[in-house]
Swiss-Prot record:
Stretches the record annotates as Disordered: 45-74, 80-99, 228-248
Family in the record: Belongs to the FOXJ1 family.
Localization per Swiss-Prot or TrEMBL: Nucleus
GO biological process: cilium assembly; regulation of DNA-templated transcription
DNA-binding region: 109-203
Annotated tissue distribution: Expressed diffusely through much of gastrula and neurula stage embryos. At stage 23 (late neurula), limited to the otic vesicle. By stage 28 (tailbud), also expressed transiently in the presumptive nephrostomes of the pronephros. At stage 35 (early tadpole), expressed broadly in the head and strongly expressed in the developing gill structures.
Entry GO MF terms: DNA binding; DNA-binding transcription factor activity; sequence-specific DNA binding
Domain of life of the source: Eukaryota
Name the UniProt record assigns to this protein: Forkhead box protein J1.2
Gene designation per UniProt: foxj1.2
Keywords: Activator, Cilium biogenesis/degradation, DNA-binding, Nucleus, Transcription, Transcription regulation
Main location: nucleus
């Protein structure tokens, strides 16, 4: 086998021509032989890059396009060559939309849901109600796909008839022969089937989003929280004694709570601009607390007098007006007798009062109350 030696080497010009054809932008082998002093600038200025052939892509560089043999291309020359290459490429023609005959084509599944197929069968029938077998036969006659498909689609038809609210079952009459019941469209949802499409009705906005006022009332921080009613609880100690536990207003933040309107269950928050002065708020809190203590003492005295009389009296809910409690006319005594008798039970010792106050107080005031 012959071996190439230094005497059989190719000429230098031939090697350069071969290397130019094999070089690319990523090959830096030309940099070893390149020199600015030995380069003929006049030949580079007069040379023109060859136009790309039709077989080449618009973005592929021509063969031998390296930095050693010619200057970089300008954008104007490249922009002229690109349209010529794109013009030679064939453009795909838009395929026309072909209509599918579902009566004869068994390979394409109809683009209809099972509920839509049931509605189409009921609309095409002259009768008001159809049996399950009649729905099956209409679908197989009009759609060849279900004629040759697995019969599991019949289970889907039965499930849609049973679970979909658009269909209702009609029992068979005694004079009608045959077995099984009938199926028909519910008149309330008959408008949902329009032009072969079963539309879905949206829920009204009132069911999805309640009024904002109800949300604001429910989440208001100073409104009283609903608790189990304690009006019918009885406390028996010694003899027959009945006491009523009334809902007590909050003595700590009376100015921030919402006033209750008579004859209405809604509460409206007070104006935040009013009562913003802390001195007025403290004075108002002290005055209301004093009045509140006097009302509680009078109510406890009334319950004590009622228990000592030995009669079981059913106390009615007194009308509330301007946060004043009215004593019962029966067993009422003068103020001199009231002052002489000592008050046994204090308002702050009543069961559940401390829990009510701490529950309705804001977090920054609970620490001061506990201390």
């Amino acid at each position: 086998m012959p071996v190439l030696s230094t005497a059989h080497r190719l000429p230098l010009s031939v090697e350069r021509d071969c290397s130019r054809e094999d070089d690319s932008l990523t090959n830096l082998q030309w940099l070893q032989d390149f020199s600015i002093l030995s380069t003929d600038l006049s030949s580079i200025a007069n040379s023109r890059p060859p136009l790309p052939r039709a077989s080449q892509g618009p973005c592929s560089p021509p063969a031998g396009d390296t930095a050693s043999c010619q200057a970089p291309r300008t954008g104007k020359q490249r922009s002229v060559a690109v349209p010529t290459a794109w013009a030679s490429l064939p453009t795909p023609s838009p395929s026309p939309v072909q209509e599918v005959d579902y009566r004869t084509n068994a390979n394409i599944k109809p683009p209809y849901s099972y509920a839509t197929l049931i509605c189409m069968a009921m609309e095409a029938s002259q009768q008001r109600k159809l049996t399950l077998s009649a729905i099956y036969s209409w679908i197989t006659q009009n759609f060849c796909y279900y004629r040759h498909a697995d019969p599991s689609w019949q289970n889907s038809i039965r499930h849609n008839l049973s679970l979909n609210k658009c269909f209702m079952k009609v029992p068979r009459g005694k004079d009608e022969p045959g077995k099984g019941g009938f199926w028909q469209m519910d008149p309330r949802y008959a408008d949902m089937f329009v032009n072969g499409v079963l539309k879905r009705r949206r829920m009204p906005a009132s069911h999805l989003d309640p009024p904002r006022c109800n949300k604001a009332i429910a989440h208001h921080p100073y409104l009283p929280v609903s608790r189990p009613s304690s009006h019918h609880m009885q406390h028996i100690s010694g003899g027959h004694r009945q006491s009523r536990r009334y809902e007590k207003p909050n003595p700590v933040l009376p100015a921030l709570r919402a006033p209750e309107r008579q004859g209405d269950a809604l509460f409206t928050p007070e104006d935040p601009l009013q009562g913003s002065n802390f001195d007025d708020l403290d004075l108002q809190t002290a005055l209301i607390s004093m009045c509140w203590e006097g009302d509680l003492a009078a109510s406890n005295l009334n319950s004590t007098l009622t228990g000592t009389s030995g009669m079981d009296m059913n106390l009615q809910d007194p009308p509330m007006q301007d946060n004043h409690w009215y004593l019962s006319t029966e067993g009422q005594q003068t103020w001199e007798q009231v002052k002489e008798e000592p008050v046994v039970e204090q308002w702050y010792n009543e069961t559940g009062f401390v829990e009510d106050v701490l529950y309705e107080c804001p977090p920054w005031e609970r620490v001061e109350t506990l201390l």
